[in-house]
Amino acid sequence: MPTLVAEKKRIQDLLGMDLGDRRFEKILFDFGLELDDVVEEEGKTMYRIEIPANRYDLLCAEGLCYALRAFLSMETYEDIDVEEGEVVVYKTGGEERPCIACAVIKGVDLLSEGAYKSFIDYQDKLHLTIGRNRALVSMGTHDLDKIKGPVFYKSETPERIGFKPLNAEREVNGKELGSRFPPGSKIGRYMRLIEKNEKYPLFEDSMGTIMSLPPIINSDATKISPGTKNVFVEMTGTDFHRVNTALKLLLGCFRGRKIESVEIRNGNERTRTPVMHNRSYVMGLGEINRSLGLDLSLSAAKSYMERMMHSVDTIDESTLRVRVHDIRSDVLHKCDLIEDIAIAHGFNNFRRELPSFFTAGSEIPLNKFSDKLRTELSIMGFDEALTLTLLSREENVIDGDQAVVLMNPKSASYEVCRTSLIPGLMKTVASNLHMKIPFRLFEVSDVVLLDKENECGASNSRRLAAMYCGHTPCLEEVQGSLSLLLKKCGVRHSYSTHNDSARYLKNQSALVIVEDAAIGSIGVCNPEICKTFRVPYAASFFEIDVEKLLSIYMART
């Protein structure tokens, strides 16, 4: 889950309460959050608070305290009031990131202790979460008083872009950005989002001053400071719902004196952002009480809803109309509102009772069968390895063309899902070269393969792999173990000639046939695989499909 790090004094100032750590922890717990830690940083007491992944509005101290003040009945939460503003943005390009939403915050207070840092940190949190590391949403905030309207959102070739990046010492052009921000830097990791495009999207004002180059960096010319009073906010991305939601989240947490909409002109099309949805749900008191097992009155249900930041009107003596404020983007269904009522009621206030039904669980046959295979291989003298499902492209040396590739890997070590268990066993050997040889290792686990017939485009497959690694490959070691294993399964098996140069030495491998069906292969490991993992020994291994073996086993029994 995301973590909010907020200064204790900032929290107390926003709540208007002098809370001790224990009292604050209890309030958070009742609200459904957890105070992870209290630490001292540079002489300041900081709270580390775990935030649910879908509550983007709680990722800054301001948003959290808006929610807590409503929860503690200190005030009724008010939705953002957006007035029609005068700023116009002409969209004449930017097809690389086609979705755009803008707004103006006037009279914002960034001078209060911790406010400016919180404003910047919240943008980073939104980039990381709802923006998926800026791939879906990126944002820029600018000092409105430094901008000469109207604003233009357009595209230019890199060589025609010249501007001074935020806090940079000199001006650069688009082609220099790659060297100015190398891939390992904080900003450089976002260059991959646009570097393949012929043109880069940018914002500029009527004087030709470049304001930002989304999703990379803002310009130094329009940067904000703690003294900034009026802020122009621009959001771009590939999903308008996320772009519009991120804008409303930022506006909801940092409201200033007034919020103004911005007119977006795209040819003959004119729209104003942010787009407010003002969703509402009609809920019956009986529905609420049946779901929660309570006997709430209408006034109690209404009060609970208001404590969770919703506006509520009474339709009749048993029905409520609940208006969900746009900042509560996590509410998707009536069940979310019922959950909010449960939180406000207090989970510790529910009566505990045993369920009126009883069910007996049972182990999934595939898992039960896998455990039996583990037991047998352990008896044969093999040690079990438990390796990671993710690995690098370079390490995924077997069936790499069938690999599921991660879009935004955190590390080069976790780029794809494994298509074989062998790389994991090889990495285990490579990490234990100081141990006595030979190595006898096995693993029973899932691989992930592309699958067009599956709705998510991929599927898991349970595999069993065993490896012998030493001065000589000793193919007879793994072949004998596999034959004994299949004999104990009570299935008829044989081997047929098979050449797979990616896995095995030429003429040193075979298909494993069980009841006339191929379930895997066995052979002497290709030395190139050993070299890839820097293993200075020879090896032999087998890898079989456990699901196929189980289906044959169950058909016989």
Curated annotation (Swiss-Prot):
Reactions catalysed according to its record: tRNA(Phe) + L-phenylalanine + ATP = L-phenylalanyl-tRNA(Phe) + AMP + diphosphate + H(+)
Compartment(s): Cytoplasm
Pfam families, sorted: B3_4, B5, PhetRS_B1, tRNA_synthFbeta
Catalytic class of the enzyme: ligase
Co-factor(s): Mg(2+)
GO molecular function: ATP binding; magnesium ion binding; phenylalanine-tRNA ligase activity; RNA binding
GO cellular component entries: phenylalanine-tRNA ligase complex
Main location: cytoplasm
Domain B5: 276-352
SUPFAM superfamilies from the UniProt entry: Class II aaRS and biotin synthetases (SSF55681), Putative DNA-binding domain (SSF46955)
InterPro entries xrefs: aa-tRNA-synth_II/BPL/LPL, B3/B4_tRNA-bd, DNA-bd_dom_put_sf, Phe-tRNA-ligase_IIc_bsu, Phe-tRNA-synth_IIc_bsu_arc_euk, Phe-tRNA_synthase-like_B3/B4, PheRS_beta_core, PhetRS_B1
Keywords attached to this entry: Aminoacyl-tRNA synthetase, ATP-binding, Cytoplasm, Ligase, Magnesium, Metal-binding, Nucleotide-binding, Protein biosynthesis
Source organism superkingdom: Eukaryota
GO biological process: phenylalanyl-tRNA aminoacylation
Residues that bind Mg(2+): 330, 336, 339-340
E.C. number: 6.1.1.20
Protein family membership: Belongs to the phenylalanyl-tRNA synthetase beta subunit family. Type 2 subfamily.
Subunit record text: Tetramer of two alpha and two beta subunits.
Identification of the protein by name: Probable phenylalanine--tRNA ligase beta subunit
